[in-house]
């Protein structure tokens, strides 16, 4: 049942919006506006819808949700099989190694905007295949592969219309939640690089509104996350919004941008302005600090009690250098107590892929095939903890397609897995 999509009249849709799920969410448009934009085809985006509903429930029943960034479909399967309950899809990782241009980019908003939806589609299909294989094998230790996907919408890749279309593409691919940030799309860069340029507060609210409208038109209760980069930004594109003017220094750049006094106060002001338009808020930090996190959380929740918060456990931080062991051990728990219900290590996929491959390659260069044999021994040990990638043929579904072929040919066929080296040597 999808009440958002099943509403036939503006009155019915307005009643849905008055349910507890939408408490604290402000829409600047009407239900009639949404119905006018829907057309007559009722398409239920099941993966995104059920993922959003599941993620929403998790946010309200867990101390916090911790996950990492997946760079491939196989990465996503590993996250789930290891016990994580959600999948994060990072724009940085898409730019670096999985975008549709085929190039390696830094996180400067250079890659095609449909790249992240494409990766989400690959991830949902990989998770579905893992579920199909599990179902076929009738495993006793059932794994729920249907993990909500939280995706990076960057700065929207343009204006409100671009954000509207991007949000639609994310939903169509299967995203449960999408975050957008208040940087200028044309100057957009990684949150931990310098010379960041913000858009006016009102302009970003329009981006959030565009994303909400897209979700409403598609009839999906998507979770929208509003991120502010105000702590580390240097410039503002325009002084059009009076709320921003107290942070201007009076200095202009050659491009016409306004230099600003950024910091936690500006981040709080922007978070408060964005709160009615998003389910969750995220302030991008320059270092991991429980004190700074508490300052932001207290200010937001003083006006918006219970507002959901997100925290980037960024690989751009030198965690061992900045925090002692005791602080690290309690970091997630204390963030959760402050209201940071979604915590994520954005670039985990990139770093594990590169570090593990370098380590293996270095050992192979020095030891030959003996190094790979040692690596296999590690995989065998990981199997005891639930790792399934060691038997790679079975992992990708050879047995599944054997079953497909036998079904087509009435059981009279030669199967691929039966006579494989994997079946004879790895069982």
Residue map of PLM features:
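Alpha/beta enzyme core
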Residues: 15, 19-37, 41-46, 50-57, ...
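A short, charged/proline- and glycine-enriched loop
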Residues: 61-65
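Universal eukaryotic N-terminal targeting presequences
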Residues: 1-2, 16
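Conserved alpha/beta catalytic core and glycan-binding cleft of carbohydrate-active enzymes
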Residues: 326-417
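Intrinsically disordered, low-complexity regulatory segments in eukaryotic proteins
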Residues: 2-11
